[in-house]
Amino acid sequence: MQELDARAKSLLAALKADSRSGATQLALNTLDQLLSYLDEVEPEGETFLRLLAELRAARPSMIVIGNALAMIEQRLSSDVQVALQAVMDIRDQLENATGTIARQALDLLPESPVILTHSASSAVLALFRNMAEQRQAFSVICTQSSPGFEGHSLARALNELAIPVTLITDAQMGLFVPQADLVITGCDTWLSNGHFINKSGTHLLALAAHAAGKPLWVLADSFRNSDADPGSVELEEMPAEELNAPPGDWITPRNIYFERVPHALVSKRISELGVFSCPAEPRR
C-alpha cells in the first residue's frame, strides 16, 4: 500500500488532535487543508485515496467529516483538477447547508428568546450571527463545555456581536434551563433510529429540558446522517490528561467526548432540507 507523505501525515494528525472545533468547522478545516495539499503536492491517486480513507476513520463520532470525504471519493479520477473541484464543491455544499439551517431556525423562534446551548456548534453560532444581523433581540446561556472549554470561544464570539451571554459550568445546566425559552444544540451524527450523537453533557441537558417542559431543537444538516447500526457507533475518548485528575493507583479518569441522545427528548430537527417534528414536540 502507498505510504502517506509527510504533508498527508501532518493533515491526518491535525484532524485527530483537534478536540475544540465542532464537526462542521473541523470538516471545513480539513477540506481547506485538502485543497492546499492537492494544489501543492499533487499526490498520486492511490496516495490520495488512502489519505481520504484514513481521514474518514479518524473521527468516528463526527460523521459529517466521513460523509463529506465519501462524496469527494465518489467523484475522483486520475485528474488532480477534478479532485480539487470535488473538494471545493463539497465544501460549498456544507457551508451553504449551515446557512440554510440558520435561516430555517430563525423563522421559528419566539420573540426576544433566551436560548440555552451546550458546546460550540457552528450551526448554532451561524443562527446567532443571523439573529444579530437581523437586529433581533435575544440572549444566550452557554455552558463552558469542559474539559475543552469550547463554550468560552462561543461566549467570546457573542460578546463581539454585543449579545448578552451568561456563561455557566456544565453542572449548572439544570439550574438554568428553567430560565431559557428553548434549548438549541448542534449535532455530530444523526443515527438511523433518530437518536443523535453530540458532545457529552447533551443528554443531561436534554433530560433537564424535558423535565422543565422546554423544547429542544437540534440543528443537523444531512451531512450528519448515518446508516450505521446505532449500537456499533464508536464514541471517541480523548486523553485523560485533560481532566487533570489526581494521581492514584485506584483512580481511573475517563474522558469520553461524545454521547447518544434519545430521539424521544428532541422536539425538532432542523436541517437544510426542512424542519422535522420529533417525539418531544409539544402537542397543540
Predicted regions and their residues:
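Long amphipathic alpha-helical segments
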Residues: 1-87
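Alpha-helical scaffold segments in soluble metabolic enzymes
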Residues: 10, 14, 29-36, 50, ...
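Gly/Ser/Thr-rich loops at beta-strand to alpha-helix junctions
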Residues: 24, 114-124, 147
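Secondary-structure boundary motif
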Residues: 40, 57, 111, 133-134
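Conserved phosphate- and dinucleotide-binding cores of soluble alpha/beta proteins
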Residues: 135-137, 143-284
